[in-house]
Structures are given as C-alpha cells and as structure tokens.
Amino acid sequence: MDADKIVFKVKNQVVSLKPEIIVDQYEYKYPAIKDSRKPSITLGKAPDLNKAYKSILSGMNAAKLDPDDVCSYLAAAMQFFEGACPDDWVSYGIMIARRGDKITPNSLVDIRRTNVEGNWALTGGMELTRDPTVPEHASLVGLLLSLYRLSKISGQNTGNYKTNIADRIEQIFETAPFVKIVEHHTLMTTHKMCANWSTIPNFRFLAGTYDMFFSRIEHLYSAIRVGTVVTAYEDCSGLVSFTGFIKQINLTAREALLYFFHKNFEEEIRRMFEPGQETAIPHSYFIHFRSLGLSGKSPYSSNAIGHVFNLIHFVGCYMGQVRSLNATVIATCAPHEMSVLGGYLGEEFFGKGTFERRFFRDEKELQEYEAAELTKTEMALADDGTVNSDDEDYFSSETRSPEAVYTRIMMNGGRLKRSHIRRYVSVSSNHQARPNSFAEFLNKTYSSDS
C-alpha cells in the first residue's frame, strides 16, 4: 500500500492517485555574499554637486523629481558624511573598514558610474544663485531619503498618520544642525508624486546604505536615519516577531522553541536558522539584505514562517498587546491550531514570573541563602512520592516546563480551556479590529463560545 495515494471510484472505475499540490509557492533566496564583493549598483555620470543640489531642490518645490537624478545626487552626496569607524567592521568575510578608518556611506558598497549625463533640469522657480552649504546638502539628503519611509506606509494606516509623520520629519530637517530649505508640507506634496519610490531598486539600495552607515557611525547628521530606518530588517517581520517574542517571555531562542508543539514549525525553523547567515551579528549586511538587493524573496517574512508568526501573535493577543491584535493573520498557516497553542503558552507566560533572591546584605547572608536552597533541592530529590502524580504539575517547580505544558494540552484533548476563550474574547472585543487582524479572527472565532 502506497501511503501517499488515495483510492476511490468514478463511474464504477477504481482510481488510484497521489493528490499533489504546490505547498511552497515562493522560491526563497538567502542573502549570503559568496564572492566577497560589496553590494553594488550602477548609476549615471557623477554630477557637479552644486548644480545637482539646485536641480533637485527645484524639483522638490515643483513636486517633480527624476528618480535617476535623485539617486545620482544621493550617491555623490555621501562624501559629506565622513565618520570614524569605531571597530573593525567585517560582514560575510568582507572587510568594510578597520578601526579608526575615516569612512563614508560609499565605503559600505560599490557604486559604479557610466558616462550617461543626468537631466539636472530646473523646474521649480527661481534658481539658487549661491552654492549650497553642507547643512543644506544634509537637509536635502534627509528629505529625499524620507520619501522612502513615506512610500512604505501602507494603506492600512488610516487618517492623518502619514501626514503627521511627514510633518515630524520636516521639523527635524528645519532645525540645527540641519537648515530649512523648503516650505512646510512640501515633503508630503512631493511624496504624492513619488508614492511608489520604495519599489525603485537603486533608490532602495541607497536608502539601505545610508541607514547601515548611520546605524553604526556617530555623526552630526545621524538624524537622517529617520527616513531610512524602515530598511533595517525589511521583509523580516517573521524573524523580528520571533526576536521580540523571546525577549517578551524572557527565554533564549532554544528554550522558546521547545514549546513549539506542531509539525508545521519544522520547515519554518530550519528556514529561519539557515547556517551561514549573520542573523545574530550586529551591523551585518544581513540587516539590510533586502534594500541592498541581496535577496529576491525573503526567507524571514511573515509569509515565509507563517505558523511561527501566527503563534507568536496569538500569544501576544493573550497578553493584550496592541501590536499583536493589529497584526494580519496568515490565513494559510493553521490559525485555528495556532490559536489553541497560543492560548496555553499565553496562560503560561502571562501574569506569572520566575523569581529568586539575587542580592544580599553581605557575603554571610548569601552563603546562608545558598545553603538553604541546597537543602530544599536535596529534600525534593528525596521525595517519597506522597504527592498524587496527577497533581505533580502543581507542586513541581517545573510547571512551566515544555513537558508540563504539553501534558496539559494533551489532557484537554488539544482544545482551549474556557478560561483561554474568555481571555481571548476579552482582549479582542475591547479592541477596534482591523480587517484580517488577529483581533478580528479571535472575535469571529470565539465570541460565540464565551
């Protein structure tokens, strides 16, 4: 008998077949750099910076920017942001810089130039007659890169959210060490003409390069990062959620994974911790691999590890976290089963803590405490078994152990307890649910059972 086949009849004829479907529709690409070359892009001929500044500023005032010219200017303007490297900077075997080296954002990447001239048109009224200062260049760079952040804000954020962000960004680039170069609200007006610029590979690359630089190098103009910070861990919402989750429940990654009682986690965990990736190395190219063009399809997105993502946010919902209640459910990744496991894990880690004395008046008190704890441990090991085995969980110090939690789930037939359902309904019903969010899922699924 072939375990992969099913047998049935069609018009009295016996049919035997394997029901096969595409399980994983995405081809994930890991961002490892194997040729020891820095990430690179090719742009047009390097411009005269003074001429380029005047042209780009003119375009901003007219809400008419040429993306090729903007990218060419942003790459050339990197020379204004020199800083000292605090330590040897190595990523994927590439020596980016040595400690004490003077570097600019250009040091992180390889920007190649052709002989193709830019347009550098003047479209926005009167031409600036004098040459711009460095603070003016810094302000223009900051405003241009902020177009990336604004274009990444999704339509789910309703009301004046995007306008408020744009206003706050403009305020930053109107005050020292920056200088006001455009009228207020110009950024939002310009953004409407560049709403999809986050999809332009070269613009995305430059935003990621600036962000990687300013996230490590202390600099007078580090606030430029306000527009580029969204390039860090871009398309890594699954990995970022897992990192936040283990901090939230105060466990290591290894300890947390012992609670993941479902076969569908296996492939996702293998994918998330693929050997050779610099997931745990600060200031690595890994952090900006999407913007730097090192991967076409992220293996770390919420869709790539959907079961992990769903579980984490069901636990977050149980704990009443707004971020989890607002997150979007991955509908194809067993949300009903993940909500059950999330209820049990939420119960374990919500409103409970593991506490012990760690600080003492003097060394004598410390020694007395340690001796008393040792005696307790020895007594526990010599237990005569008078506690009913069914109640062992409630008397053992290991009630939070993966084994104890798994046993409770199995004893309840893999179903949520009424207390879990009441908690889910309580947190979700008091929250204004967004479409397809975890709050909406919990409301629709469990409100009738409460």
Curated annotation (Swiss-Prot):
<protein>
    <recommendedName>
        <fullName>Nucleoprotein</fullName>
    </recommendedName>
</protein>
<keyword id="KW-0766">Superantigen</keyword>
<dbReference type="GO" id="GO:1990904">
    <property type="term" value="C:ribonucleoprotein complex"/>
</dbReference>
<dbReference type="GO" id="GO:0030430">
    <property type="term" value="C:host cell cytoplasm"/>
</dbReference>
<dbReference type="Pfam" id="PF00945">
    <property type="entry name" value="Rhabdo_ncap"/>
</dbReference>
<dbReference type="InterPro" id="IPR000448">
    <property type="entry name" value="Rhabdo_ncapsid"/>
</dbReference>
<dbReference type="InterPro" id="IPR023331">
    <property type="entry name" value="Rhabdovirus_ncapsid_C"/>
</dbReference>
<keyword id="KW-0687">Ribonucleoprotein</keyword>
<keyword id="KW-0694">RNA-binding</keyword>
<dbReference type="InterPro" id="IPR023330">
    <property type="entry name" value="Rhabdovirus_ncapsid_N"/>
</dbReference>
<comment type="subunit">
    <text>Homomultimerizes to form the nucleocapsid. Binds to viral genomic RNA. In nucleocapsid, binds protein P and thereby positions the polymerase on the template. Protein P acts as a chaperone on free protein N to prevent it from aggregation before encapsidating genomic RNA.</text>
</comment>
<dbReference type="InterPro" id="IPR035961">
    <property type="entry name" value="Rhabdovirus_nucleoprotein-like"/>
</dbReference>
<dbReference type="GO" id="GO:0003723">
    <property type="term" value="F:RNA binding"/>
</dbReference>
<keyword id="KW-1139">Helical capsid protein</keyword>
<keyword id="KW-1035">Host cytoplasm</keyword>
<comment type="function">
    <text>Encapsidates the genome in a ratio of one protein N per nine ribonucleotides, protecting it from nucleases. If expressed without protein P it binds non-specifically RNA and therefore can bind it's own mRNA. Interaction with protein P abolishes any non-specific RNA binding, and prevents phosphorylation. The soluble N-P complex encapsidates specifically the genomic RNA, with protein N protecting the genome like a pearl necklace. The encapsidated genomic RNA is termed the nucleocapsid (NC) and serves as template for viral transcription and replication.</text>
</comment>
<keyword id="KW-0946">Virion</keyword>
<dbReference type="GO" id="GO:0019013">
    <property type="term" value="C:viral nucleocapsid"/>
</dbReference>
<dbReference type="GO" id="GO:0019029">
    <property type="term" value="C:helical viral capsid"/>
</dbReference>
<keyword id="KW-0597">Phosphoprotein</keyword>
<keyword id="KW-0167">Capsid protein</keyword>
<keyword id="KW-0543">Viral nucleoprotein</keyword>
<feature type="modified residue" description="Phosphoserine; by host CK2">
    <location>
        <position position="389"/>
    </location>
</feature>
<comment type="similarity">
    <text>Belongs to the lyssavirus nucleocapsid protein family.</text>
</comment>
